[in-house]
């Protein structure tokens, strides 16, 4: 069973990384991955109100039909699971707040703990991208504030609750408007 799970995760990871593997880094049709998470936004909310921009993103890209959360179904464990492909008991972020007998207390409200790479096991997708020479960016994604395996995304923002929705959007648009040699091909964005 573990082999089947690992095989499925490997195929999923390859499917996410494959668009980055291009023979021409300067081609104008290079693909981009923007993984957007709207916390507490049910999968069907976009059908209950007018959401033309989200509809366009879904039409031109991909949208999950549904997700089955990891246990526990909390923000930090699940977002880091999406980034690594691992369950919380394998990547270490088992709750939004927890005690680790070696590292001490972890809390999403403790900026020092959130920025301590020792808490984060596994390899998030931005670390894999950076190791392959692919520029990545992360806006508030769990784990991106810490140097996981000594690596941050090229561009990243520490969590700031007061950051306006417009400034968040402007930052991501700015990243996508950078010159090709500076532009991230992978963006993880927690909204």
Task: State each model region's role.
Residues 29, 71-72, 116-120:
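A short beta-strand-to-alpha-helix junction
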Residues 1-10:
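Bacterial N-terminal signal peptides that target proteins for export
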Residues 87-191:
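His/Asp/Glu-rich, glycine-adjacent segments
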Residues 18-29:
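Bacterial Sec-dependent signal peptides at the C-terminal "C-region" and cleavage site
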Residues 9-19:
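Bacterial N-terminal signal peptides
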Residues 30-42, 57, 82, 129, ...:
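Beta-strand elements within well-structured catalytic alpha/beta cores of enzymes
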């Amino acid at each position: 069973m573990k082999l089947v799970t690992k095989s499925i995760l490997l195929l999923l990871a390859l499917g996410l990384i494959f668009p980055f593997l291009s023979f021409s880094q300067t081609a104008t049709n290079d693909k981009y991955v923007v993984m957007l998470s709207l916390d507490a936004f049910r999968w069907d909310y976009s059908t209950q109100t007018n959401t033309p921009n989200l509809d366009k993103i879904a039409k031109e890209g991909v949208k999950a039909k549904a997700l089955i959360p990891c246990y526990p179904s909390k923000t930090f464990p699940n977002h880091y699971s999406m980034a690594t492909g691992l369950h919380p008991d394998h990547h270490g972020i088992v709750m939004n707040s927890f005690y680790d007998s070696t590292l001490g207390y972890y809390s999403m409200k403790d900026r020092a703990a959130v920025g301590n790479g020792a808490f984060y096991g596994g390899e998030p997708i931005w670390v894999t991208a950076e190791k392959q020479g692919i520029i990545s960016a992360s806006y508030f994604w769990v784990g991106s504030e810490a140097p996981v395996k000594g690596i941050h995304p090229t561009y990243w923002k520490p969590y700031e609750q007061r950051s306006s929705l417009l400034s968040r959007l402007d930052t991501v648009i700015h990243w996508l408007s950078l010159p090709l040699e500076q532009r991230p091909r992978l963006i993880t964005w927690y909204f």
